Structures are given as C-alpha cells and as structure tokens.
C-alpha cells in the first residue's frame, strides 16, 4: 500500500471510530464501501445505499441479495476489485469475528469492522478478501 494510502487509512479509521453506528449510513457494510470509494473505486454499495435505515431493513436487503458474501462479491465486481488470498493493509473482506460475519478492512493480521465504534481483532476466519 502506498504511503499516502496508509495515511488515508489512518484518518479513515479515526473517522470510523468517532462516528456512531447507524444502519444505512455508517454500518459495517457501508463503512467498507466508503473506504473503497475513498480509495478511488466506483461505489460497490450504490444499488442499496439510502435504501434502508434500520437493522431489519439491512437484514432484508442482505437476504434479498443472497447473503452478505454474495452481496459483497457483487459489490467487489462493481468496483472492479480482484479477490486475493493474501490481503494487505487497506484491502477489504468478509471475516468471521466472535461468530459474526462482518464486512471489514484489513490492517495486517487484524481487521477493523464498524460496530459501536470500531472492532479491531484477528478474525477467526477470512471468508473472502479483495484487493483495494
């Protein structure tokens, strides 16, 4: 990852930490999509951005999309992201943390996901990752 992008990631994580979790605005899915857009790619969340404001609305969209993995894969395709088996800081993925599947940003061995604040942990499993 280029030096400028490292600095941008640091600033982005600070912003992630300071903003409350809000379904349809700053949830784990849209936060990762925001990072992808900030990194210069098309918006992977464009088809559903602004279409939900509650946890129930989010769950309905995820279910309609065929699950979070299918939803993220289509978003990665829209943003022209390539799948990677060796994620680097700044890459994104679907990870399993504490038994939950979360959209997250790679920090190295740990990943950051939007919760109430930011959850930073080593995932139990990297389900799929994409190069940003």
How should these model regions be labeled?
Residues 34-40, 69, 106, 110-112, ...:
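Bulky hydrophobic/aromatic packing residues
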């Amino acid at each position: 990852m280029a030096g400028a992008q490292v600095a941008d990631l640091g600033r982005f994580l600070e912003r992630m930490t300071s903003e409350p979790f809000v379904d349809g605005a700053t949830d784990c899915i849209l936060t990762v999509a925001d990072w992808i857009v900030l990194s210069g790619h098309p918006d992977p969340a464009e088809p559903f951005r602004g279409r939900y404001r509650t946890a129930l609305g989010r769950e309905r969209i995820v279910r309609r999309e065929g699950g979070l993995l299918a939803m993220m894969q289509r978003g990665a395709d829209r943003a022209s992201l390539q799948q990677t088996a060796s994620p680097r800081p700044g890459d994104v993925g679907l990870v399993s943390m504490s038994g939950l599947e979360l959209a997250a940003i790679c920090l190295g061995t740990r990943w950051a996901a939007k919760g109430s604040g930011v959850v930073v942990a080593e995932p139990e499993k990297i389900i799929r990752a994409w190069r940003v």
